[in-house]
Amino acid sequence: MEWIADPSIWAGLITLIVIELVLGIDNLVFIAILAEKLPPKQRDRARVTGLLLAMLMRLLLLASISWLVTLTQPLFSFRSFTFSARDLIMLFGGFFLLFKATMELNERLEGKDSNNPTQRKGAKFWGVVTQIVVLDAIFSLDSVITAVGMVDHLLVMMAAVVIAISLMLMASKPLTQFVNSHPTIVILCLSFLLMIGFSLVAEGFGFVIPKGYLYAAIGFSVMIEALNQLAIFNRRRFLSANQTLRQRTTEAVMRLLSGQKEDAELDAKTASMLVDHGNQQIFNPQERRMIERVLNLNQRTVSSIMTSRHDIEHIDLNAPEEEIRQLLERNQHTRLVVTDGDDAEDLLGVVHVIDLLQQSLRGEPLNLRVLIRQPLVFPETLPLLPALEQFRNARTHFAFVVDEFGSVEGIVTLSDVTETIAGNLPNEVEEIDARHDIQKNADGSWTANGHMPLEDLVQYVPLPLDEKREYHTIAGLLMEYLQRIPKPGEEVQVGDYLLKTLQVESHRVQKVQIIPLRKDGEMEYEV
């Protein structure tokens, strides 16, 4: 056992381990591709079983060195070619590798499903393990012959094989996960296997292709793919820095809904699901609009859908009964907002019309004070999803919207939230909702209410909107551009549209005309 203290023995051991690992890279790649065909629960077992059987095979080959040496002796000749048992094994392995790599490439490129539902799981599992062992036997022959030529001690060779296989076992799982999570890398690996299969066939016919050429080509390809993966990583990092995950997801879904599949970042499974649709619309326009509204629901706040306090029909708490009855006759809502005096700034609560009706049917005088109910109170920055949850928990459909100083800015109802998804819902009476008041004119322009939310406007007119804006209505957009209250007749260009103020009352923009422009900045119609 004096050879254990010999430094040259240890140098040979380390060299053999490195060679085993280098020669085993292609084997690991093939294992990663084969293991993907199995159900997730069987993949680890297939990798471990295949590599352990491969290690056992290499140890048996090393134990039969005398037989192994005879494999290089010529068996027969055909014309100018002389074949040994090793050459025949190389030919078989090369053609096997070419066949498997070609079939795998065909499945990847044609999008075929490699899973066969009619096949038994056990047979499939052992089929994959068998392929792993057969392929490893082919690669083992070269590595074992190399080991025999480099080291004289059998124990050193066996130790190198055991250590190398153990390292391959540890690396196989992360390598499998990495390869299968990057479709372009799978194609690259299959291309490597084609090159290796071709080199094995050439070696079987006696044409020696230096391994350095193969490794140089593989290394160059890996470098190019690394640059490609770096570019993808930088693109995703740039997108994540400029847009939230919710925004990127919403944009990708909306591109899919509009049929722009080539612009959306899709994984392989999603792309395969959509490939059969061609250029057909997957969803109709109504479905696309509704899904877009749902995806953007949490991006909107209650202040963007509220009815301004200036548009609220209210009644004084101390109003005489006759005035209350007159208001009930012309009222079209189920609730009345009660104020302390004629000032709409001081909102006390709401009164349900049905409660007033019950008072009247009982012959009692109408008394607003005893019927006042306190609605929910939302901060103006509250997103719609939390607002919807509060409506559900409180079992009420009405809320006041207040600013940071506690002043009431407006009211919002459950119907307002529902309309952000389904669009404007008609009432039993023909009432025009001022917030959705937009009509298309005969000349191609639009006339809209100044208090129409921009999120609703873009459903009709695709204006570019600043995601960090602090305004919510068309009037707010005009004031942001002008930095003052617009005057009638003033115009502002926003993207490819000209916004013209038509009507202003009490410092409030009532009507706005939206005129589409040509690319040269001229109007698309005659004034």
From Swiss-Prot:
Protein name from the UniProt record: UPF0053 protein YegH
Chain ranges passing through the membrane: 14-34, 51-71, 81-101, 122-142, 145-165, 185-205, 207-227
Main subcellular localisation: membrane
InterPro entries: CBS_dom, CBS_dom_sf, FAD-bd_PCMH-like_sf, FAD-bd_PCMH_sub2, Integral_membrane_TerC, Ion_transp-like_CBS, Transptr-assoc_dom
Subcellular compartments: Cell membrane
Any one GO MF annotation of this record: flavin adenine dinucleotide binding
Family: Belongs to the UPF0053 family.
Key words of the record: CBS domain, Cell membrane, Membrane, Repeat, Transmembrane, Transmembrane helix
Species: Shigella flexneri
Gene label: yegH
Keyword Lipid metabolism: no
Residue ranges constituting the CBS domain according to the UniProt record: 306-366, 371-429
Gene3D superfamilies: 3.30.465.10, CBS-domain
Recorded GO CC terms: plasma membrane
Bilayer topology: Multi-pass membrane protein
Signal peptide stretch: none
Family annotation (Pfam families): CBS, CorC_HlyC, TerC
Entry-linked SUPFAM superfamilies: CBS-domain pair, FAD-binding/transporter-associated domain-like
